[in-house]
UniProtKB/Swiss-Prot annotation:
Residues that, per the record, bind ATP: G281, P282, P283, G284, S285, G286, K287, T288
Region (Disordered): 441-465
Catalytic reactions on record: Couples ATP hydrolysis with the unwinding of duplex DNA by translocating in the 3'-5' direction; ATP + H2O = ADP + phosphate + H(+)
EC code(s) of this entry: 5.6.2.4
Entry keyword set: ATP-binding, Helicase, Hydrolase, Isomerase, Nucleotide-binding
Coiled-coil parts of chain: none
Protein name (database record): Putative DNA 3'-5' helicase Rad25
Domain Helicase C-terminal: 469-621
A GO molecular-function annotation: DNA binding
Enzyme class: isomerase
Amino acid sequence: MTDEEPADRDDDSDSTPELELDAVYDAIDAVGRPHLTATEFSRKTDLTPDEARAALERLADDGDIERQDVSEVESVWYPTDIAEVTDRERVVLFPDRREVVVEHPDQFTRAQLSQFARLQDTNRSGGYVYELREEDIWAAPHESLDDLLTTMRDVLGERSPHLEEWVTSQWERARKFRLKTHEDGYVVLEAESDDLMGNVARPKLDDDHLRAPISDSESWVNEDATAEIKRTLYEAGYPVRDDRDLETGDAIEMDLRLRLRDYQQDWVERFTEQGSGVFVGPPGSGKTVAAMGAMAAIGGETLILVPSRELATQWRDELVRHTSLTDDDIGEYHGGEKEIRAVTIATYRTAGMDRHRKLFDQRKWGLIVFDEVHHVPSPIHRRSADLQTKHRLGLTATPTRESDDEEEIFTLIGPPIGTDWGKLFDEGYVAEPEVEIRLVPWGDETEQSEYSSTSGHDRRQAAASNTGKIDEIRYALAENPAAKALVFIEYLDQGEAISEAIDAPFISGETPHARREKLFDEFRRGELTTLVVSRVGDEGIDLPDAELALVASGLGGSRRQGAQRAGRTMRPAGDARMVILATRGTTEEDFVRRQMRHLASKGIRVTETEAEAVEPPAKTE
């Protein structure tokens, strides 16, 4: 050994690879725990064990990681900020099960996943489980298969030939059948191949659906049966593309008085190209305004279907405010009024009644707008889906129904348009709500004993009506003294008790229409800062300035209602907060967590806290 050798080793030590801290995080992710040994680090990098140890020591000298000796020959290394590791996003793909498990996903990741997968489960430690279903691929809002696969690779961080082969097959499956208009004006069902027509379509469809074969791959369609054809083939696993020439109706003169946002203009252009579709976006994203843009683009007489008279009145007001239409151009058709004009707004219930049906069928509508489109799958509203010869536009933030048949919306109305919520949050068009599940202790032991001794509906009502929630509502309102607040309830007795306790008006289905309108208007103008609202407030009532939504009873609601209630706070400016109260240790806990999955799947972070017992404020003389 020469005298120069030690110096050479010093030079080698100076050339130790300078790795970024992210390399340690990546290695920790790979080993699956928040610490690692130098040997493990070397296996996850291109370094030798000595180089790995030297690199770790350099990071330790810089204060980025810590060292803990666990034996005479071995040490473990971990980041100084251990929380950064435990809260770090991890995406794990299980291609055979078509599942994606994500720990601590950020908003963008959740928004991307929602475009091709369905959130199945969440847990309190920040884990999300997504499932890729056939329906998710069929309805993916992408222009091409390449666009869809690019989104998947971006969020998954890897390519899975097995999964991508399945996705490709489902994407192609959704393009095996299409409806088109023959040059002679009648409707044709076209299959991609003779085998598909002969072995799938014709055995499942009878003479009521198909009039006669045109060729081995084409059949003449009974036009009144187009909705049933779509439904039947969808159930067989073959969604049908609708490329028919749709009716435009008698022309109307209508101009917008405002400029559409870029994404709204994109929605309108995609809709006019397709002839049908569903605008899916968070409340506050301007779906109604975009629908007016679609009305102007189609330029034909328009029928607008809504779930309530209140929403019909709102539509009329917004049309007069934002377009060149006048009151004389707009009719309302429901229990209060029955006028059919160039633009007519009707309730789903009235439009579906036999004695009123001919009035709507005989009018040559160019466009049918289905507001709150999640109503369409309900049996009471199913008739509205039979208006298949028109341009069809659905509007919703939440296509979810508890029966999980939301896919029918996209089959009978059209494919989704504009489903990326995360982009709208990031660009500031919509305020991302802060959603909190707050677990509340019982108000007194008597209520808890009553819950334990009952079952069924009585048990659910006992948990929902826990009087401990009244004190928590007072506390939440005191936390947000300047916020305009909506308190949602499920049971009338509970609503009246809360209304009296916080001195705020209570609006329910029993409230006369005129008084409801008066209270809503006072809330909009800021003359009232708090309202207690039953389910009547869940369907599109325009309360644009609500900053706080308090849900006092979760067991009576659905995932759709949960998203709508959060939507009362999701507006383009200001703070947005939603607090769901659930009685600790009851079935209400798990129900509320399931209820919030839809919001979580759209990129909204849902947190959970334990409420302390709150002493009611002392009464003043």
